[in-house]
């Protein structure tokens, strides 16, 4: 399935996303992004923090989605995805030696890198830092089989 235009994406019913393993909430977010495509396109001329703020005005787009999107699309060096389970644990493991951390601890730990926190996280990930796992990997449910 190719999404060549926002119009094409808007026309896809949510159950079609199930075949791709995309659950309803994410399908709604994709539809929202397609509906506001021209608004999103205008964020390309904004700096990173302003673009993140603009994206978070859209329904279904929170701090995590805005940070990851702008970190990639704008190269925003400080777009830290707060709320991500793995990122906070990667930071805790790599920089403090503790296998688990909280978002607040991550923000405190990365404060010395203000302005470059996304870069630091990406460097840690690329360097192979990964917090230890304590449970079996969660089984992904194929929503198409429901």
What are these model-predicted stretches?
Residues 1-146:
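HhH-family (HhH-GPD) DNA N-glycosylase catalytic core used in base-excision repair
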């Amino acid at each position: 399935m190719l999404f060549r235009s926002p119009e094409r994406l808007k026309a896809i019913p949510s159950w079609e996303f199930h075949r791709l393993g995309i659950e309803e909430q994410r399908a709604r977010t994709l539809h929202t992004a397609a509906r506001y495509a021209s608004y999103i396109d205008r964020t390309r001329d904004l700096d990173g923090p302003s673009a993140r703020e603009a994206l978070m005005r859209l329904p279904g787009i929170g701090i995590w989605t805005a940070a990851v999107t702008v970190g990639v699309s704008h190269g925003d060096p400080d777009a830290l995805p707060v709320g991500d389970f793995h990122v906070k644990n990667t930071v805790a493991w790599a920089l403090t030696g503790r296998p688990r951390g909280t978002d607040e601890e991550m923000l405190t730990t990365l404060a010395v890198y203000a302005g470059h926190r996304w870069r630091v996280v990406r460097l840690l990930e690329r360097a192979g830092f990964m917090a230890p796992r304590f449970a079996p990997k969660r089984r992904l449910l194929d929503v198409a089989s429901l």
